[in-house]
Each structure stands twice: as C-alpha cells, then as structure tokens.
C-alpha cells in the first residue's frame, strides 16, 4: 500500500491554525499541540493513582474478547502507570463512518511515536460513547453501489426508537442481519466478500448489545495494535466515577458559569459556539428506562422527561450508591475522561476539538489539567480506477477533496459544446439587458410601463437561460459515460459534499481490499500529521 501526505486549501482554518501555533487558537487550550515541549511536559506529569484500578476495569470490560498479546501487555503497562493517548466515538452501525477507524489509527500512531521518542510506554485507549442515547445518529450508514454509481443509505429499523443509552440497547438480531444483507447487496462481490460476511454474522450471533457488537468489530480490526477499549457506560467504570459525579452535582452552578464564560470568550475570538445545551447541571440520569437530562430550578434537580424532582441530598446519594445511573453530557464527558486517565493527548475530530476549546475554565474549576488536544488523522483511500479517471479528466486530487467535481464537470460539458452557440446565446442575453435599460429610460416616471418592461425582460432572460440550460443538458446526455465517471469520482472522494471518511463505511474498504487491510502487516506505517493522508491500497 502506498501512502502520501497532501496539503489541502481548507475552508475551515481551525486545524491549520493549530498547526501554525496561532496564538488566538492555542490560547483556548492548555497546551500548544504543535510544540514538542507540550508533550515533554505532559509525559513528565505525576500520575493520578487510578491507573491500576482502571486496568482492572478495562480487563473486565474486554473479558468477552480474545485478547492479543499486545493488548495483554498494554493492560499490564497501564496497571504499572503508563500514560495514554485517548479518543472516542459513538457506536455506529457496522462500525459507522471511516473516521472512527482513522481516529483509532491516530491514537495508535501518536502513542507509538511518544513511546519511541520518550522511551516510556504510552498506551492507546479508545473510549466508546455508549452513554449516548440519540439512536438516530448511529442506526444508519452509507454504501457505494458501483452499478448505480451512487451512495445508498442503509438503516437498521426498529419499531420503537430506544430512549435509553446505546449500551443498554439490544437490537433484534434477525433485523440486524437483514440490514447487513442489504448493505452487501449494494457492494460489489469480491474475493473478500464471503469471509467478511461471515465475520459480521459471527459478531451478531456472539454478542447481544449494540455497543458490544461495535466493540467486537473494532477488536477484530485493531487487536494486533494493542488498542484497549472501554465503554463509558460500563458499570464498574461508573463506580470509579462516583466521586466526580458528586463533585459535579455540588459545583454544578460554578461548572455552568465556567462553561458559559469560556464559550463566550471563544465567540469573542470570532468562533461559532459549538456546544448547544440548556442544562445547568450537565449530567443525565437513567430513570424509567430513559436517559433524562438533569437541570436545577433553584430548589430541585429535575428530570426532563418524567418531571421527577430530587433535593440535593437525594441526588448526591444516588451518585454515591448508584453511579451507574448517571452519565455525562458533552461538557462533563471530557472532564470525566481526564479525571480517570493519565492522558498525554486527547485525539478528536474537527468538531470535537472545537468543543474542547469551550471547556478550559471547566477543567480549571475542578483542578484537572486539560491534556494536549490533537486533531485526528484525516485519510482518504484512492483506488486505481479513480486515480485513472482523475488523470483522464486532468482533475487535481486536492481540488476534488476540497470542492468536489461540479466545477470540473461543468467545465467539461462546456468544452464539448459549441462555443459559438454558447457565445451567441450569452450575447443575446447581454443584448436583451441593454435593450431593457434603453426601454426603461424611455418610460422613466411611469411605474406601470416600468413594471411592463421589467416583466418583459424577465421573460426574455428566462427563455434564453432555459435555452442555454437545455442545450447544455443535451450535451450532458450525449456524454453519459463521462457524466457517470464524474459522479463516480464525486461519490468516492467527495461524497455528500464532504470527505470520504465522513460517509463511507469500514465494510466497504474491507470488501474492496481485504479483511486484513488494516493489519500491521498490510497497512502502511503512518506518521502523525495535521495534513491529509492519501492511501492507495
């Protein structure tokens, strides 16, 4: 497999500004992610004393998996005080978008580089956001159908949308297998298809909860790298979190004030507010099989779905004795994660790192230092066919990744058309506009006639526009094969107006290139970069 790094002219300059140590952006974080001294400081930080307990919890969580020797070793390293590089993601259908796997590769790559540079073992940890309850965000994925030249949405259907956390949801296995079958129908059959289908079927048969199936697929893909997994909703982990839940409940108003103040500062720097929440407690409580947002009305803590209320002593007692009923929101999850782990760096997507920029004062309030916040690696897969099509139409890869192919497609259509025809129609449009101006001069002061002339002009311009559009549409139809090829480039490299990794699913890559494509023996060694990585299997 070939690997190269390209620099894109990104519309969103947040990550490029992190790369260049822009003082406005770096001021939002505890550490400058582009400076080596930041890593030296983090590596030398004293541990929090929770590493041995965490290692036991992670071992228990992964006990239903057959651990690799690398994972066994990393659990031992963690127990002995090794620091971690960490990141997380929701449990998407069949693994969800490719960026989930690229985030894990980011964690693997950075932890290895830190281990090699500092001669201290750094452990890669992936945090599964099983506490989330928005099932609509994880119950679907997309698949590219080569025969149709288009993307198809594949969705797991359920009679009732679960309101509990994803970790507490147990999908119907028959329906899930039907969803899997639908996905494979759209994918082309390769020498890898049958083996991949068997792996997926086995995972569905062997595991019951939504997140356990997700975990098993990740484990199948990354066990050789020694990645450790933990679900935020895992009950033994929640018991470890009880002291912090109590602190959050006791300081909830100060926490909310700190968050709002930091968010306002980011907006004062010209950034849009990323975290949208009305709560002033920033925790959820599981009650009546629903994950319910907690708020405080000045007297009581109140649940948003059942209107159940608690006085302060009651809700703190729940945190003490039943912490598994609590879960974090977008504000408190990073805080809890860093309170638990001895983290060198947190790896996040473009939106996630902007969330973290709004939390600096929250960390300071709880005397928890924000780790280095690193943008994850961004990766696109380029196959031989797409590479040949880019060459055929002389389209720069970097341009497609940023803008898609619509501009190049329109240019191609016009190149196939009669230049004289287009020029004459455009000339007629310009002539009509000049005529309209002259006519308006003739009827100046008479509003009825002005309206008449403008309406007449509008009709003529519409007719000329229609003529030109229909003519170009005919040219487009005459070049149907090329249009399909442009669409193929678009759906592969810039699907739905964004990067491939935001839409394409892991199974598509495994089906095309083999179930061992992500294994250390096959996947190219990566170096951490803020730029874009192109991998050609």
Swiss-Prot record:
Ranges in a coiled coil: 422-450
Transmembrane segments: none
UniProt cross-references to Pfam families, sorted A to Z: CC_BshC, Rossmann-like_BshC
This protein's name: Putative cysteine ligase BshC
Enzyme class: ligase
Family, similarity comment: Belongs to the BshC family.
NCBIfam families linked: thiol_BshC
Enzyme Commission (EC) number: 6.-.-.-
